[in-house]
Amino acid sequence: MANAAKTIKVTLVKSTIGILPKHKDCVRGLGLRKINHTVEVEDTAAVRGMINKVNYLVKVEGE
């Protein structure tokens, strides 16, 4: 059986209006669209980097 990838839930809790374009790209890269939208993403270094860049906009569960 393949290794089950660890996942984390990320929720957008603040609007992306008026933020840096790079930060907006990170939010979209995580798959988030609207406020209170939650997605489940794989726990990888790339995803962690995107979350750290926009940590003031998101809430993370399942660390």
Curated annotation (Swiss-Prot):
Keywords, sorted A to Z: Ribonucleoprotein, Ribosomal protein
A cellular component annotation (GO) from this entry: cytosolic large ribosomal subunit
Biological process according to GO: translation
InterPro entries in the record: Ribo_uL30_ferredoxin-like_sf (IPR036919), Ribosomal_uL30_bac-type (IPR005996), Ribosomal_uL30_ferredoxin-like (IPR016082)
Keyword Ribonucleoprotein belongs to the record: yes
Keyword field contains Transmembrane helix: no
GO MF annotations in UniProt: structural constituent of ribosome
One Pfam family in the UniProt entry: Ribosomal_L30
Subunit: Part of the 50S ribosomal subunit.
Family affiliation: Belongs to the universal ribosomal protein uL30 family.
NCBIfam families: rpmD_bact
Protein name: Large ribosomal subunit protein uL30
Organism field: Hahella chejuensis (strain KCTC 2396)
The gene coding this protein: rpmD
